[in-house]
Structures are given as C-alpha cells and as structure tokens.
C-alpha cells in the first residue's frame, strides 16, 4: 500500500482525498496547519460544468437543491450608467446532470470534508521540512512530528509553505496591483437586476460581480476587484487589510465607482490583496502541486475552484495509472486560462472611452457567437 501525504485541507486537497479514499492501494493523510477547517464564512464560489462533472463522481449531485444555485446567464453592465449591455447564456454548456453552479464556498468545503473519515485529516500540522530519501519522502512538522510518504501532494494555497520548501524559497507569488473586496448584500437592497443570473459590472479600473449562492432567500454574494497600489511595507503588514480604517479607505475610493445604494448595503466586507503566480515549478519525482500552490490565477475568469478540482482529478488519474503527463498537461491548461483571465481583466477595467466603446460592441456580438463561445469557454468548461 502506497502512502500519500497531502499538505493543506483546501478544495483541491480534500477533493483528491475523496477520489483516493475508496482505492485500497493507497493510504491518504491530509496535514492541515490550522486547528480546524473554517466552514462558517458565507462567501460564494462559482463552479463551471467541468468541475461539476467531477464532483458528481463523489456524490455532489446528492447535495440538497436548496444549498446551491444554477444561474442561467451572465448579465453585463456598465457601472456608470448601470446600463445592461448584453447577456451570455452560460446554461448552453449545461447538461442534465452538470450545470453551472454557485454556492457558498463553506458548503463545498463541508461537503468534501464530510466525505472523509475523521482520522484522515491531521490538524495543527505545520510543514517545516521536506526531504527526499531514495523512493520515500520524509516530512517534518511542528512539535517534532515526523511522517514518511511515497507521494507528496502540496495543496496549501497561494502562499504555499510546501512549495517554498521544495523551491528553496525561490518561487513566490506576486502582488497583482489589485484588491479583492468580498461581502454580502440583501436581496431587497438590489433593484433592476435579475437575481436568477450572475450580474457583472464593469468600471474604470474596477469591476464587481453579484450572484445568488443558493435557492433560499439568503443574501447575495458580492465580489469586486479594484486596481490598487500597495507598498512593500503595506503588503508585509497583512493585519492592515482587516483594519476598519483600511476598509473605509477602500469604500471611500469606490464612492465614485459604485452606486451608493450598493456600497452602503454591502455587509461583512473583507479586503484581500490579490496575489498571482508568475511561473511554474516542476517538483521532483512523486511530489506534486495542486490548486493555488500550482498556479494562482487573476480573479477575472471564475475558474480558481474549478481548476483546483480539475487538476486534482488529473493528478489522481496520473498516479493510479502510473503516468507522467500531469505537469505538462496542467501547464498547458493553466496557460490558456491565465491568458483569458488577463484579457477579461483588461476588458472589465477599461477606462479609455474609445476602448470602452469597442469593448461594448464586441461583447454584444461575441456573447451571441456560438463558434467564439465554444472556443473561448467551451475549451475550459468541457473536460
């Protein structure tokens, strides 16, 4: 029996553990640095059909209907006029069992966690050293805890300590000159929006998205991305982003970019600096990276969670079939999505009136062009 160690109990780590749990040839252990998994936050996540198909293999289709939502379209708006430009029918990529889905991230994590036995996840295990020892991998954690594995899967997020250890701290994420703003907003505070769809608003160096996270009458999810310069000292002071003064400064900056009705009614606001990957790391034999540890995308294509799931499925198939194609295939897919994310960011944040004019015309045409959509979205949404 081969031992698999997974560093990090995020979406990718939990999902691949669910795939391996029924295979008697492998023993899985997840090492999580925190003392528990936070399933209290109500912020949303979008899952396109490529990941729903994979999640259904472990019973996601049995999740209660009330706990998830299937939007049919993305409605595009210009912030200034609050004027709808066009819509994109994302349901065209749906099948009977695989539909574009939004839900609370905590609900997805809870589902993945509940699929595993309690003893699979070891909490309060902070990785400190990774060493290759012939065909085995030696792991050292805090409190002098040691472990040995045959395969090591590093899935501990964008600031991956595991990745830093195997790269000798040479590969780090880069600040993307933008702040992500998360929150919730009551349905009765929103007017002139189809609350059955995803609403995407484009502005000057800023865009935001509002969407439902379940079929109950709960608050809508709000996520905005604002271009914002930070000094090195500010980036090192992560507690800064939790301070009320900083959050208020962001809200003040948005007064000219966002309708007062929405701005004043966003609840549970949290701000995060957006970090992205700038390169790829190919680890040694039997060591793998997943999720944001593999590559962190700019948040303009809503593929972070879906790619964590898809990458985990690819790695699972590679390991059980003793293949070596995981890295090259994943890099090719990631490059495709990263390029689309950058293009989306440019389009959503355009400030030049001429560029905005042609962007709006292009959106009206391209959102109805099936050949374009099959190439731009179909290559991502279908696996």
Each predicted region: which residue ranges?
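C-terminal auxiliary extensions adjacent to catalytic cores
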Residues: 360-383
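Conserved N-terminal helical subregion
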Residues: 4, 21, 48-186, 229-234, ...
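Conserved mid-domain beta->alpha element of the FAD-binding
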Residues: 5-21, 153-154, 181, 245-246, ...
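Conserved FAD/dinucleotide-binding core of flavoprotein oxidoreductases
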Residues: 86-100, 104-105, 109, 189-268
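Conserved Rossmann-like nucleotide-cofactor binding loop
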Residues: 12, 36, 159
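Residues at the starts of beta-strands that form the adenosine-phosphate
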Residues: 3, 26-27, 219-221
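Glycine-rich FAD pyrophosphate-binding loop
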Residues: 21-41
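Conserved N-terminal glycine-rich FAD pyrophosphate-binding loop of Rossmann-like flavoproteins
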Residues: 36-54
């Amino acid at each position: 029996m081969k031992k698999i160690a997974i560093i990090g109990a995020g979406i990718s780590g939990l999902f691949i553990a669910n795939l391996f749990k029924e295979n008697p040839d492998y023993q899985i252990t997840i090492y999580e640095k925190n003392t528990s998994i936070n399933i209290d936050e109500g912020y949303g996540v979008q899952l396109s059909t490529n990941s729903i198909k994979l999640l259904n293999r472990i019973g996601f289709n049995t999740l209660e209907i009330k706990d998830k939502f299937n939007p049919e379209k993305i409605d595009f708006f210009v912030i200034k006029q609050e004027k709808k430009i066009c819509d994109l029918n994302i349901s065209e990529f749906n099948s009977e069992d695989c539909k574009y889905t939004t839900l609370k991230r905590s609900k997805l994590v809870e589902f993945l966690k509940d699929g595993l036995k309690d003893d699979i996840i070891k909490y309060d295990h902070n990785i400190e050293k990774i060493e290759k020892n012939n065909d085995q991998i030696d792991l050292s954690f805090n409190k002098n805890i040691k472990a040995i594995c045959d395969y090591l899967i590093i899935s501990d997020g964008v600031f991956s300590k595991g990745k830093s250890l195997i790269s000798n701290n040479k590969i780090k994420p880069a600040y993307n000159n933008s702040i992500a703003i998360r929150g919730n907003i009551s349905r009765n505070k929103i007017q002139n929006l189809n609350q059955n769809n995803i609403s995407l608003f484009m502005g000057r160096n800023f865009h935001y998205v509002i969407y439902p996270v379940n079929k109950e009458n709960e608050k809508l999810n709000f996520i905005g991305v604002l271009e914002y310069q930070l000094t090195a000292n500010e980036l090192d002071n992560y507690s800064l982003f939790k301070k009320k003064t900083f959050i208020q400064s962001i809200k003040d900056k948005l007064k000219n970019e966002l309708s007062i009705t929405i701005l004043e009614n966003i609840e549970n606001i949290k701000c995060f600096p957006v970090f992205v990957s700038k390169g790829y790391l190919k680890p040694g034999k039997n060591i793998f990276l997943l999720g944001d540890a593999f590559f962190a995308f700019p948040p303009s294509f809503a593929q972070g969670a879906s790619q964590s799931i898809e990458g985990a499925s690819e790695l699972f198939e590679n390991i059980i079939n003793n293949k070596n194609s995981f890295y090259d295939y994943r890099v090719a897919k990631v490059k495709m999505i990263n390029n689309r994310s950058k293009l989306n960011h440019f389009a959503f944040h355009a400030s030049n009136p001429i560029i905005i004019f042609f962007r709006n015309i292009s959106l009206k045409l391209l959102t109805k062009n099936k050949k374009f959509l099959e190439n731009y979205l179909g290559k991502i949404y279908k696996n």
